[in-house]
Amino acid sequence: MPQYLLKRHLRHLKSISVNNISLIDESKKIGSRVGFIPCFIVLEDTRSRKPFYVSELETGSLSSLHFTELVIPKEFELCTLFEIKIAAKIPSFLLRHDEDELWCFVAMHTVNLDELTYIGNQRDDHITMEQNLPMIEMIDGWYALPNKNIRYTGLQISPVANMNNKNRKRMCPFNSLVKLSKLTQYTGDMVEEKQISTNKIERLIKSTHNIGTGILDTYQENIKMIESRCEIKRQKLKRLKDQLSELDDGNELNDVDSNIETYRDEYANIYSKLSNAKEAIEKLQKKKLIQLINVFKNTFLFDKDVGLISFQFDDDEIEVEEFCKNLERVSIEQIYDRYNEYPKSVKIINAMLGFYSLFIVIYSYRIIQRKLPFDIVFQGSETIVGRKYRLSFPESRSTKSKEEFHIALRAFNENIMQFTQYLGHITQSFTI
């Protein structure tokens, strides 16, 4: 069976055979060959330099040791590059009397499965190799390392034997028939799969062609429809031109021009009225805001020590623009600092939060009539924000009360941000 793997991986490895195992370098002609030596092999990752497989001990003819039942870990099954280390036990007669048994690596080979040399479907006993050279069995045949000396030492057939072979009848062993049957079955499977793939591709091509033909027909119908509409428009345009040409002195065109000018004048008047109304509404809103500020000046909301809005007012006028810039969010650190400084000031803190929320509610809902991101229901010192959270500093130190207060304060600060964005459009000062 010929080789059929397009890409070889460790998961295709079946066994490893090591040929001509020797502890002595034969090129130096030193020492003698040892008959039987226990050996094992180690497969090592070339990147991490860590072994991922160690075989069992094998003892036999050193001309060829066969290592089977290779169990490769799953993380290395797709590996194509690894290193084979051949370890052998040094015979006792080569050691000193006081030395324990010793092992050594007789050879180390780096194996790239994509660069192996194909030998055949079966291992040939007439192949001679260099010493300590491995042969690798994949699922599609036997391979050897590249650039290694491999010689075939088959028996020479004499002429007499060759003549006798002519008179012999050709025989077909059972194993050859089995191999031929497997090869025929494999070839038939390949042809069948090829035919199935060809039929699928032909069906896809036909379906794609049909889809393209349908789209082309749709485009052609749309083009015809557009051309017919264009023809209708051309006819209407021609009729309009004929009607215009029938006009005597162009008085009707002058009437059309006068009507256009009239429309422009009316639009300018309406726009001017709307602009004046808008300015009047903005002035009224500013006036209401200043009145609201004057009302809350009687509270401690703007007090620098107790209040939550740090803004200094003059005696005669209020700079609305400066007030808008200084309208700040309530800091949780500010609340806790005041509480730590005056532990009995919980009622004052809640009163300031209530005044601040009442200020936002009156201006948003009554003056500018704008909704806030989170609804505010004023209930004195226990204002409800977002319909479920109380904006009041908790007297109890429980974790749940603190979390609810923090959520309510964050929602209230988002309302202040919405409020200041609208106030940012006010750029003029109003004098009281």
From Swiss-Prot:
Record flagged with keyword GTP-binding: no
Pfam family name, one: VPS38
Lineage: superkingdom: Eukaryota
Transmembrane region(s): 348-365
Localization (cell): Golgi apparatus, trans-Golgi network membrane; Endosome membrane
Keyword field contains Transmembrane: yes
Family: Belongs to the VPS38 family.
Protein name: Vacuolar protein sorting-associated protein 38
Native organism: Candida glabrata (strain ATCC 2001 / BCRC 20586 / JCM 3761 / NBRC 0622 / NRRL Y-65 / CBS 138)
